[in-house]
Amino acid sequence: MQQIEVKRLLVNYKTLEEFRNFREFGAAELSMKDDLEANIIENDSESPFYGIYFGGKLVARMSLYRIDGKYDRYFEPPQDYLELWKLEVLEPYRGKGFGRALVDFAKSFNLPVKTNARQRSNEFWTKMGFEPVTYQTDRDRGESPYVWYPEGVKEQLSEDEGSVETLEN
């Protein structure tokens, strides 16, 4: 297979139009159209959206947000980390390495990566080297959190309960 290149997507109306394909053919739960529209309105030039084009068509995409370490009570040692949201590959392009390429791109920053398994994707995240973590309502925005830990990083435990500390957003 040819080299897969992950690109930062521009926050503009062309990208919005490309996202409509995902809304039409993808899972409604994974729609990023509203997220992109909010970034256009806010004139946010630092796009959190990344994607892969195949044959001139956007076929895979995700949101990737860097969270400042000063807000981290999740990892030991506390540090910056990434939140990966709404990874989606259009149905005809699944099983071709596009999802793995997006995940590998996120891992290339060598920071912990948090995500939430949606659309029965638990097996995919496990295959990508992510570990399921216990869901906590005051910390996690989704009920099926998964984390990838780079070498030397582990989950931070509270001293009194032995449970995971919360992350306030």
From Swiss-Prot:
It holds the Pfam family Acetyltransf_1. One of its GO terms (molecular function) is acyltransferase activity, transferring groups other than amino-acyl groups. Its EC number is 2.3.1.-. It is an enzyme of class 2 (transferase). Transmembrane segments: none annotated. InterPro entries: Acyl_CoA_acyltransferase, GNAT_dom, YlbP. Residues 4-160 form the N-acetyltransferase domain. SUPFAM superfamilies: Acyl-CoA N-acyltransferases (Nat). NCBIfam families: PRK13688.1. HAMAP family: Acetyltransf_YlbP (MF_00824). This is Uncharacterized N-acetyltransferase BH2580. The lineage of its organism: Bacteria, Bacillati, Bacillota, Bacilli, Bacillales.
